[in-house]
Amino acid sequence: MKQTITAETSIEIDASPSEVWNAITTAATIKKYLMGTNVSTDWKEGSPITYEGEYNGKKYKDKGVIKKIVPEKIFRSTYWSSMAGKEDKPENYNTVTYNLDDNPDGTTIVRITQDNILSDKEKEHAVSNWKMVLQKLKEVVELAAPKN
């Protein structure tokens, strides 16, 4: 069996887990922080999830299956990218997990992990991509979050 690598990154968002959860499970909000991506799913474990859009002038349709949902805590799905140049077969899917941790100060730590990465170069790309996504998520959520 091949050794695989896991990419991980996190960010602190000045909002409640509920506000962050709504942002990661609402298609219209996802589109704001995930490069204009249109997401389709019913947000239930075992259901398919698709990501469609255009990146650098190239259309894509990525997909996966929702594996675990714990509201305001965990969102996990498999993920295959049409742009990765890999065949659409189970061993080429990553598992992407969003973990939300509630801080006593009212902020939320969002940690994203992506597994089944085959090289350090692929890991660097994943970490860079997720950092960009998390920064944009933070901006979108904090802009919408009511301030006390």
Predicted regions and their residues:
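Hydrophobic ligand-binding cavity/cleft-lining segments
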Residues: 1-38
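Intrinsic-disorder/low-complexity, polar/charged segments enriched in Ser/Thr/Lys/Arg/Asp/Glu/Gln
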Residues: 4-10, 48, 61, 74, ...
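Solvent-exposed residues in well-ordered beta-strands and their adjoining turns
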Residues: 12-14, 101, 113-117
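A solvent-exposed, acidic/Ser-Thr-rich amphipathic alpha-helical stretch
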Residues: 37-51
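A conserved amphipathic terminal alpha-helix motif
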Residues: 109, 115-148
